[in-house]
Amino acid sequence: MSQTAAHLMERILQPAPEPFALLYRPESSGPGLLDVLIGEMSEPQVLADIDLPATSIGAPRLDVLALIPYRQIAERGFEAVDDESPLLAMNITEQQSISIERLLGMLPNVPIQLNSERFDLSDASYAEIVSQVIANEIGSGEGANFVIKRTFLAEISEYGPASALSFFRHLLEREKGAYWTFIIHTGSRTFVGASPERHISIKDGLSVMNPISGTYRYPPAGPNLSEVMDFLADRKEADELYMVVDEELKMMARICEDGGHVLGPYLKEMAHLAHTEYFIEGKTHRDVREILRETLFAPTVTGSPLESACRVIQRYEPQGRAYYSGMAALIGSDGKGGRSLDSAILIRTADIDNSGEVRISVGSTIVRHSDPMTEAAESRAKATGLISALKNQAPSRFGNHLQVRAALASRNAYVSDFWLMDSQQREQIQADFSGRQVLIVDAEDTFTSMIAKQLRALGLVVTVCSFSDEYSFEGYDLVIMGPGPGNPSEVQQPKINHLHVAIRSLLSQQRPFLAVCLSHQVLSLCLGLELQRKAIPNQGVQKQIDLFGNVERVGFYNTFAAQSSSDRLDIDGIGTVEISRDSETGEVHALRGPSFASMQFHAESLLTQEGPRIIADLLRHALIHTPVENNASAAGR
C-alpha cells in the first residue's frame, strides 16, 4: 500500500535513512510542490542497463532517478579520467508530493559548522591554468571554449543526516531561480544542490534543452539595473552564450527529427548571480536512455567542440570529475504509454560523504579573451550560493524590466532566423535541391549535425559519416567536407592526412563539393595558399564580411586562416578560383572554383544570419561549375 507523504518523511528523518530524494522542480511539478521519493540503489555499468518498468496508461509515475558521473562520457567514445565514480540508479519504490510549506515544517534546522574550508586550487593557480588553456588549447585550434573545474573542500562538524537536510532547507528557503533544488541520499553519500540548468527534458515527445552562460556576479549590496544592462551589453558574455547554443543545437540535431527550435534569450536570476539563457525545443521518439547517452554532456560545463573538450579536460584535470558536470535524470511513465524525462546538470551541488567531507566543484567558461583572474573570481562566486550564509532577503530582480527585455531581444537581431523558426516554417524554405544526395564527412565536430538539418530543409537527402569510417564518394551528387579541431598543416596526424587525401581526390575527379572551416583550410593549402595562425583566435565571433559581393553576418570558429593578396587565382590543373577575403588583412573567408566552394565561417551556426541561403548559393556554384559529364553521371543514377 502506498504511504502518505508524512509517512515517507518519517522514514527520511530517521538517523540512518534508506536511499531517498527530495526534489523541487517548479517547471515540471509545479510551483510549491516537491517530489518525495524512496527507492533501492543499483549500479548499472552503462546507461542502456538502467532497468525501466513497462510504461502504462493511467496516472503518471516516476520510475528511476539516475545520477550520472562525468566518466560515463566514455560511452560516446570520448576520453575521460576513470575515477571509478559509479553510475547510480534509484529504482523508485515509494513516491508522493508535498508542499514546500508543509515540508519546511518537518525539516530540521540544526547549525552547520564548516571546518578546514579551502579550494584545491588557489585563485592564482586556477588563473595560471586558465592562461595555459587559452595559449595552448584555444590558441592552437583545439576548440572554442573549455570549462576547467576547481573544488571547494570542507568538513562538517558532527555530521549526520540532519545536517544535510538542514543544508537543503536553507537552499530551499533562500535560493531563487534554480531548475532543481534537491537532496539525494544514496546510502553512502548525499548530494545537496540548487542547479540552475536543465540538461534535457521530454514530455509528450517534446524535448527541451536549456543552454545557460554568461555570469553577472552581484555586488555585496545586491544587483542594480545599471550593472545588469552593462552585463547584457558585454560581448564576451554574449559570445559565451552563442557558443553553447551552437553546441547544444548540435546535440538536438542528432536526437530530434526536425533539429532544434531556439527560444529566448532570457535573464535567469539566482540568489547571488544571474545568467543569460536560451531554450531549444524539438520532437523526438527515441529511447530516453539513448537520448541521455547522445547528450553526454552539456557544453556549458565541458566546452566545444565536445570531443576536443574531453581531451582538454583529461589533460588539465587528472584527478577526474566525479559527478561534477554530470546529471541527475528522473525517468518516468507519462500515463499515456510513453516516457517522461527530466534532468538537471550537477553543478552548484555539494557532494557529501558519510563522514561529513564536502566537495563543491565549480568551473568557468574559458574563451579566447578570458581574463584569468576574472575567471577565478567567477568560479569562486558560483560556489557562494552553497557555502555562504545566504542573504536574509531575496535580491532585487530585473528579468521583466522593460529595458532588460529589450536588451535581451536585441541579441537576436543578427543571429540565424533558421534556428529561431519552428519546423513548419523551415519547410517553407525554397527546396530547389530536392532529391539530390549529399555526403557529409565529419572531422570530429558535430556542427555536421546542424549542417545536415539545414541541407534537409533545402530538400537534399543527407548521409553523415566520420572521416574514420570506410566510405566512398560514388553515388552522391555533392560532398561536404566538414569542420573539426586541429592544425591543418600537421599532415602526420591521421585525420589531417585523411582530409588532404580526400580533398585532393575530389579536386582531381572534379566532384562537386563544399569544404567548411578545417576542411576549407586544408583545401586552401592544396591550392597553394599560405596559412597563418591567428594572433587572437576567432572562437564564437560574428563578423560582417563581403562574401563575393554580398554583405553577410557570419560566425567564425577558427585559429588558422588562409591568406591571399588577390581576389582571383589561376591555378594549373584547377582553373580560376575566386577568393572572398578581408581587403586589409588578406584573410580568406571563402573560395569558389570549378566544381567546389568553401567557407572559413560556419553557415550552420546561430551566429550566421542567413546560413541556409549562403549554403544554397555555394552548393549551386559547385554544381553549376562542375563539368557536364560529372553532373550527368551523378544525376543519372
Swiss-Prot record:
Name of the featured protein: Anthranilate synthase, phenazine specific
Source taxonomy: Bacteria, Pseudomonadati, Pseudomonadota, Gammaproteobacteria, Pseudomonadales
Other noteworthy facts: Component I catalyzes the formation of anthranilate using ammonia rather than glutamine, whereas component II provides glutamine amidotransferase activity.
Record field: catalytic activity: chorismate + L-glutamine = anthranilate + pyruvate + L-glutamate + H(+)
Single GO biological process annotation from the record: phenazine biosynthetic process
Gene Ontology terms, MF aspect: anthranilate synthase activity; transferase activity
Gene label: phzB
Pfam families associated with the record: Chorismate_bind, GATase
UniProt organism field: Pseudomonas chlororaphis
Glutamine amidotransferase type-1 domain: residues covered: 437-628
Keywords: Antibiotic biosynthesis, Glutamine amidotransferase, Lyase, Transferase, Virulence
UniProt pathway annotation: Antibiotic biosynthesis; phenazine biosynthesis
Region spans: Anthranilate synthase component I: 1-434
Active site per database record: C517 (for gatase activity), H602 (for gatase activity), E604 (for gatase activity)
Role of this protein: Involved in the biosynthesis of the antibiotic, phenazine, a nitrogen-containing heterocyclic molecule having important roles in virulence, competition and biological control.
Signal peptide: none
Domain of life: Bacteria
Gene3D superfamilies referenced in this protein's UniProt entry, alphabetically: 3.40.50.880, Anthranilate synthase (3.60.120.10)
Keyword Transferase: yes
EC number: 4.1.3.27
